[in-house]
Swiss-Prot record:
Protein's name in the database: UDP-3-O-acyl-N-acetylglucosamine deacetylase
Active site: 262 (proton donor)
Function: Catalyzes the hydrolysis of UDP-3-O-myristoyl-N-acetylglucosamine to form UDP-3-O-myristoylglucosamine and acetate, the committed step in lipid A biosynthesis.
Organism: Citrifermentans bemidjiense (strain ATCC BAA-1014 / DSM 16622 / JCM 12645 / Bem)
GO BP term, example: lipid A biosynthetic process
Length: 305
């Protein structure tokens, strides 16, 4: 799809905030082409609007938080992943609290509601951010790189020193079908000892076995077990889709991440956006859409398929 899209109708959610433990209601509304994704804290007087963009990220501890002045909205990554995954470029997000509801810990409830609301196609072309040169950020043993590629792809190498998790690797070559079918339902996860520690410090107050995979000393303690054998790394890729959508554009490039999280994802997006020599923005015509690298991009021979 080369044209910008929004929702066909409204979609409303109500649920618990993972960290605040408070019930929050959120409504997605259609928006005009060129709007982007804009959150509105409607519980404040006057309401405060915050564009979902990397320049508005104010915190990446445990989740991704955007803010403006004293107002903020946290835990936006699952909703942002669902919007990107369903092809939604423009939407208003009315929210009556400081945190997006965690729902079941995945993007699946958001995807289902967006799918039910339908999609409206505009006549305005999308802008694709096409990576021209590699960009890398490193933090200790954590690393994230985005390199030129003919497609949008995320490859994630996850490593934990725990027998139930250990190392997991998976790649997503992005399409709406692959994201919705293979990644949207992967749930957030945490270690029991860390969850108990966070709750003692006033965090993760809404966390439960209903909205997260919890890992104890001997493995997953959720009675239903895992939705996928490698659900953990699938969820890390889901988070990455949401965090990387804060470029404000559809992406064409290959992200390679090792032990990355919200903070490093944000640093990668920020580093990319401040280096205009490393990317180009393209509005594709129908004729050019299937051959993006013929437009102002160097030789193709070294690019990944």
């Amino acid at each position: 799809m080369i044209f910008q899209q929004t929702l066909g109708n409204k979609a409303t959610f109500s649920g618990i905030g993972l960290h605040t433990g408070k019930t929050i209601t959120l409504t997605l509304r259609p928006a005009e082409a060129g709007t982007g994704i804009v959150f509105h804290r409607v519980d404040l007087a006057p309401a405060v609007s915050i564009e979902a963009h990397a320049s508005n990220v104010v915190n990446t501890r445990l989740s991704t938080t955007i803010g403006r002045g004293d107002a903020s909205v946290s835990t936006i990554e699952h909703l942002m992943a669902a919007l990107y995954g369903c092809g939604i470029d423009n939407a208003h997000v009315d929210i009556d609290g400081p945190e997006v509801p965690i729902m079941d810990g995945s993007a699946a409830p958001f995807v289902a509601a967006i799918t039910k609301a339908g999609v409206k196609v505009s006549g305005k072309a999308r802008k694709y951010l096409v990576v021209k040169k590699p960009v890398t950020v490193v933090d200790g043993d954590k690393k994230a790189t985005i390199i030129p590629s003919r497609h949008y792809k995320i490859s994630f190498d996850m490593q934990f020193a725990h027998p139930a998790v250990k190392s997991q690797f998976r790649s997503l070559e992005f399409s709406q079908e692959s994201f919705i079918g293979d990644f949207a339902a992967a749930r957030t996860f945490g270690f029991l000892a860390e969850v108990e520690m966070m709750k003692s410090h006033g965090l993760a107050l809404g966390g439960s076995l209903e909205n997260a995979v919890v890992i104890g000393d001997n493995g997953v303690i959720n009675p239903e077990g895992l939705r996928f054998q490698d659900e953990f790394v699938r969820h890390k890729i889901l988070d990455s889709v949401g965090d990387l959508s804060l470029t404000g554009h559809r992406l064409i490039g290959h992200v390679k991440a090792t032990k990355s999280g919200h903070d490093l994802n944000h640093k990668l997006v920020t580093e990319l956006l401040k280096r205009p020599d490393c990317y180009t923005l393209i509005e594709f015509t129908p004729q050019a859409f299937n051959a993006p690298f013929n437009i102002g991009i160097p030789e193709l021979s070294w690019l990944e398929a």
